[in-house]
Design a protein with these regions (language model features):
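Helix-to-loop junction immediately C-terminal to a conserved catalytic motif
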Residues: 54
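ABC ATPase NBD coupling module
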Residues: 20, 71-88
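ABC-type ATPase nucleotide-binding domains, specifically the catalytic core motifs of the NBD
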Residues: 15-17, 107-119, 128
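Short coil-to-helix segment of the ABC ATPase nucleotide-binding domain corresponding to the Q-loop/switch region
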Residues: 100-108
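Conserved ABC ATPase signature
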Residues: 138-142, 146
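The feature captures the beta-strand-to-loop junction immediately N-terminal to the Walker
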Residues: 39-41
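Conserved ABC ATPase "signature" region
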Residues: 69-70, 117-134
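Conserved ABC transporter NBD signature motif
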Residues: 62-70
Length: 157
């Protein structure tokens, strides 16, 4: 079976004094339909790894392939298509636009990706998240768990 994601001898270094190399020859294969978790102590490269895996950071050496596309050589258009239809991000801190309702936060995700905003699709996602009755609420009126679900829904749209 073809890997969903493959990293081969990935090196990522930051030059800030002193130089830091959080990824040094990392190789791994993620098969389709596999869930992974990245754990470890603070400052050891977890976020760097995820950013490299998603094509947000380019490594100094090595190769990162998503469905055979080399993310280290991908054009901006290729990366945009992958981010729209393949790789989504949910950050540890739920980043929501505080002046926008739950519905508007999801709507903005579709507009930012260039997709036609489909009201039914947004309400369907809100229903799946158990937030359909909170569609017109601002993030300040949502619980921490509801905010996290809203951020997850945004990544899934």
């Amino acid at each position: 079976m073809e890997p969903l994601l493959e990293l081969s001898d990935v090196v990522k270094e930051f030059s800030s004094p002193p130089p830091v190399r959080p990824l040094d020859g990392l190789s791994m294969v993620v098969p389709p339909s596999t869930m992974i978790a990245v754990t470890g102590v603070s400052g050891k490269g977890k976020s760097t790894l995820l950013n490299v895996m998603g094509g947000l950071l380019r490594p100094e050496a090595g190769c990162v392939r998503y469905r055979k596309v080399d993310l280290t050589q991908a054009t901006a258009a290729q990366l945009d298509a992958i981010h729209r239809h393949g790789i989504g991000f949910v950050f540890q801190t739920p980043y929501l636009f505080q002046a926008l309702t739950a519905y508007e936060n999801l709507e903005l995700a579709l507009r930012a990706s260039g997709e036609k905003v489909a009201r039914d699709r947004i309400f369907e996602m809100l229903e799946k998240l158990g937030l359909d009755e909170r569609a017109e609420h601002l993030p300040s009126a949502l619980s921490a768990g509801q905010k996290r679900r809203l951020v997850l829904g945004r990544a899934l749209l």
